[in-house]
Amino acid sequence: MEAKAGPTAATDGAYSVSAEETEKWMEQAMQMAKDALDNTEVPVGCLMVYNNEVVGKGRNEVNQTKNATRHAEMVAIDQALDWCRRRGRSPSEVFEHTVLYVTVEPCIMCAAALRLMRIPLVVYGCQNERFGGCGSVLDIASADLPSTGKPFQCTPGYRAEEAVEMLKTFYKQENPNAPKSKVRKKECHKS
């Protein structure tokens, strides 16, 4: 019987994944981010991998659903919970051995959810300078927070430039779901 590849825990509790695994899963996350961009969503894609199997995946669905909480990580968490239910598996056992691969640093909301779900390792692309929950704005990942589970490890910077370029492309385009501006522009009268 072939052993399944996956995250390995060191004696100090640190998790690690191979470069090959990281490349494989981050490529799929990047494809999901591109799909989000093609659908006028903020280009973030992620995968939750347990025992070398994708148990949850997501891309941003905020504009599509008109629900500000439908970030890629939240969509993936919902899918992983469904995966556990369908297989009669304990979510806590699965999540404690699941690695999340995501193209952009999780926001504060998503980092808090990942911590509550006890995800041990998050591999991400670029930093989220506005809302980052893994150290860019707040450090939900490793802060001493009561009743929130164990801190999780972060491996930042994987294909960061590519993730930033997708974000730039998104923010250059018009968002058809954005509310209309209520600011009145003064007309210039030339004499």
From Swiss-Prot:
It is an enzyme of class 3 (hydrolase). The keyword tRNA processing applies. It catalyses: adenosine(34) in tRNA + H2O + H(+) = inosine(34) in tRNA + NH4(+). This is tRNA-specific adenosine deaminase 2. Its EC number is 3.5.4.33. The keyword Hydrolase applies. Keywords: Hydrolase, Metal-binding, tRNA processing, Zinc. PROSITE patterns: CYT_DCMP_DEAMINASES_1, CYT_DCMP_DEAMINASES_2. The active site is at E73 (proton donor). Transmembrane segments: none annotated. The gene is DEADC1. Residues 20-145 form the CMP/dCMP-type deaminase domain. GO terms for molecular function: tRNA-specific adenosine-34 deaminase activity; zinc ion binding. One of its GO terms (biological process) is tRNA wobble adenosine to inosine editing. Probably participates in deamination of adenosine-34 to inosine in many tRNAs. Belongs to the cytidine and deoxycytidylate deaminase family. ADAT2 subfamily. Its cofactor is Zn(2+). Zn(2+) binds at H71, C107, C110. Gene3D superfamilies: Cytidine Deaminase, domain 2 (3.40.140.10).
